[in-house]
Amino acid sequence: MDSNTNENNSHASSNERQSSEGHDDYLNRNPNSEATEGEEGTHPTTGTQPVAFSIGTMFIITPQANFEGGENDPFANPFQPPVKRAVKEAWDSFEPLSNDQLMDLTCPICYDDMNENDEKQATKMPCGHIFGKNCLQKWLENHCTCPLCRKEVPHETVGSAHPPILFIIPHSHTLRGNQGNTAVSQENASNGVHSDFHPSEELNNANTDGRTGVDEPARQLHRIAFNRIRFILAPNRSATNTPVENTHPENPDSNTSTPTTRSEPLAGEGASIDAENASSRQETTPSDSRPSTLTSLFNAFFSSMPDRPSSNEPMTSNLTSNSGSMTNSTSTDLPTSNLPSQNAPARPVEPSPSIQPPNLLNLPTASPESTSWLPGSQTNIPANTNRSERPFTQLMTFHGLPSLADLPAVLESMFRPSGNNNLLNLNGIFHPDHNAQTENGQTLPENTDDTNSNATSAVPNLQNLNQQNAVTMGTNTPNNGSSPAVHPVIHIYLSRPPLQPAVSEQETPSEAVSREGTRSTDATMEDSSRPPSNGSFQGPGITHLSEMGQRILQRFQEEMENRMNQTRSESSTPAQQSAAGSSINVDTAGRQPSDEINIPGEYENSSEVAGSRNQTPTHSSIAVDTLSNVAVDQPAISTPSDVVGSDAGDTSKVSSGTSTPRMAAPIARRSNRHHPYSRPSSTRPQCQLEDQGICDPNDRFVHFECGHSVHERCQQSTSNSENQMDEEIGECPKCRNEEHK
């Protein structure tokens, strides 16, 4: 039990270093309210704070078509395995042939005639096979064998474990830097990042100044798009030449190496890394830490962030300064089972709260005195650190443009019950009305009474829980009678080369539903990805990524809020059943907020919700009968008339409080709804003599006492053909025919 507590404390303490006063103000800021004069440092807070999001676009410059990289060319694709290609000297051993020397003029690759021009010159390889020059050249750019017999030629291994250039452009609403923090201002100035930059103001100034100057809007948009670019340049790569005598082509020499893991023992409590470990860490060559995947690239990017403490400051980090992978310390209990590895899956990358995220939004960084990288069991954590004000961070990376099908997988990784990244169990409470968990994992019962005791019963339990966690971590929690909320910050990045064709409309997710009430602090985002005037990037790709990011961000927020509501209702069901017993009379109008699932926006109070299968039922479309614990107003599934028997009035028993999907359990058929395969009923009369083929749909009907209806002309024609008497014309012809039979 203590090990689990220390494990959670280690994750929570490792996330404390990214917070500061400006960071908390940014998370607590409400976009719908403006701070008045004299109240610049105060922000209105509510019972449940929204989740703070940030989204950015990553552009990775990769080689283009017909790429002929030399030995010192750094622009090689880092996401592909090393390629063995033929060297240029291998062409010296190839023999050009004329038409007289050829038995067949057809190229085995393109099936075109050879020797029509210089590009289709017939070329004979040392193995004896003949191909067109252009086809053979394209093949040997990525291969070192004959296309037919697979015999090798002199080749070189081309591949680079280093990323070429990484651009990260944030799209989110940014915050002004802390003007009082001179150290941060100097650091941002040295990195080319201005702390007083505000995208919305720059955009407004660009629109207003555009009337006076023609080049002013382009200059302002250029600042918006590229003023906050963080990039990484890759060192030169080298190609490994392999002679033709190599008899093991399946095991070539590759310059890709796995970063070594170095343990850094600590001298004692509150002690820093000694000089020997620091010097050995500085002497690490770049070949020891070459990230080969995007996950490793992020790890290297985090470990080399300029926001980290300088070398002369006492460092307690368990991350090496120039290594691209996570390293463990022998004196700590920090788990690394869920950390990204060198060969991790491409999508989605597992979020890790143990990694420091990049300071993309230019938020004020934490000072070295208030930074702690050690678990909560260590004693070098500052006493003035408040855990409740330290938001934790989750990093999510997508290769390409993620579809809506990827969101459930991301939510599962965030809400799984036993995961280290669980938003509900990460050593804190997401917001005060969530279910609290004690140290042994038991759920605290919630008071279901309608009196004011509900507001005073759950809060002290949460407060005591926070105080216990604070004592364990060595922090001080203010005793203000309320439970502080933990604000997770989720960074979502979209990775896509800018020169690829834009994704079609079929691949883009649908427009997000407009929601009412409190929005996220990053819901209002500017299109900061417009291309500059020099045309180094293609505009449609960047603009498309910006629009995609906004839609994905809004949809992700909606999916997360719906999932949180479902989790809250499911977690409150066992506590309610244990407190309520078999049956409790509870007024439906006075139910607890945890018993309701609200979906704001156009789904609320809408008649179309009943026809949707995947939407969560709202409190306006479901009424819970507390006496029998039965949902009596669930949407029905219509069945054919011959299937429904005498039990048409029965209703399916659906337990209250459970998040059962709509139309999951069939109930009684409604009289005004019909199965699509059932015979449609109609109030229009039907002629009983239509089988004779003389009916006119526009003719008038004649109704008889027996209930049959016949067209007037059909009746007259039948009577005339049978030579009936005038007194028998009023008889139904259908009944008369049945009597004769």
UniProtKB/Swiss-Prot annotation:
Keywords: Metal-binding, Nucleus, Repeat, Zinc, Zinc-finger. Residues 316-332 have a biased composition (Low complexity). Residues 1-50, 177-214, 238-387, 500-543, 561-619, 638-688, 713-741 are annotated as: Disordered. Gene3D superfamilies: Zinc/RING finger domain, C3HC4 (zinc finger). The keyword Ubl conjugation does not apply. The keyword Phosphoprotein does not apply. Residues 18-27, 731-741 have a biased composition (Basic and acidic residues). One of its GO terms (biological process) is proteasome-mediated ubiquitin-dependent protein catabolic process. It is found in: Nucleus. GO terms for cellular component: Dsc E3 ubiquitin ligase complex; endomembrane system; nucleus. Residues 1-17, 177-193, 252-263, 277-302, 333-344, 357-386, 563-586, 604-619, 652-661 have a biased composition (Polar residues). SUPFAM superfamilies: RING/U-box (SSF57850). A zinc finger (RING-type) spans 107-150, 687-736. SMART domains: RING. GO terms for molecular function: ubiquitin protein ligase activity; zinc ion binding. Pfam families: zf-RING_2. This is Uncharacterized RING finger protein C2A9.04c.
